[in-house]
């Protein structure tokens, strides 16, 4: 079962439809306790990095996501979700990320 993390800023339906069309089983995860029902995770995202991290924090997703990935559960970040896997982002000021991927999201110089 592929869990799609629903923290209020994702393109959930598009990601779910893509997985289903590839014949994958999908569970939209809106409660961190449901992560343990999944074999892998997708972290989608549309919007600003800081707000996304605030949403993940207020929904209490950060520790369960990090723990599951550290225990070997695969995770795929889509759009903003990939940025969130990094250590930080400088979008609208430096904000700490999940730290699951080494590196920081930085602005490309003109």
Regions found by a protein language model. Give the residues of each.
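Structural signature of beta-strand start/N-cap positions in the alpha/beta core
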Residues: 25, 40, 74-76
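Short acidic low-complexity segments
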Residues: 26-37
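Cysteine-nucleophile active-site neighborhood
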Residues: 47-110
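Conserved S/T- and glycine-rich ATP-binding loop of Class I adenylate-forming
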Residues: 15, 41, 52
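Short acidic/histidine-rich motifs immediately flanking catalytic phosphotransfer sites
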Residues: 35-45
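N-terminal beta1-alpha1 ligand-phosphate binding loop
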Residues: 2-24
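Short gly/ser/thr-rich secondary-structure transition/capping motifs
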Residues: 21-28, 56-59
């Amino acid at each position: 079962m592929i869990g799609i993390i629903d923290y209020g800023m994702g393109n959930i339906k598009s990601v779910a439809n893509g997985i289903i069309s590839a014949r994958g089983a999908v569970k939209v995860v809106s409660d961190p306790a449901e992560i343990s029902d999944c074999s892998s995770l997708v972290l989608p995202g549309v919007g600003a990095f800081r707000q996304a991290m605030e949403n993940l924090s207020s929904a209490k997703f950060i520790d369960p996501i990090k723990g599951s990935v550290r225990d070997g559960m695969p995770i795929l970040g889509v759009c903003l979700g990939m940025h969130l896997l990094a250590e930080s982002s400088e979008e609208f000021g430096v904000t700490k990320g999940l730290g699951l991927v080494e590196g920081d999201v930085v602005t490309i110089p003109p």
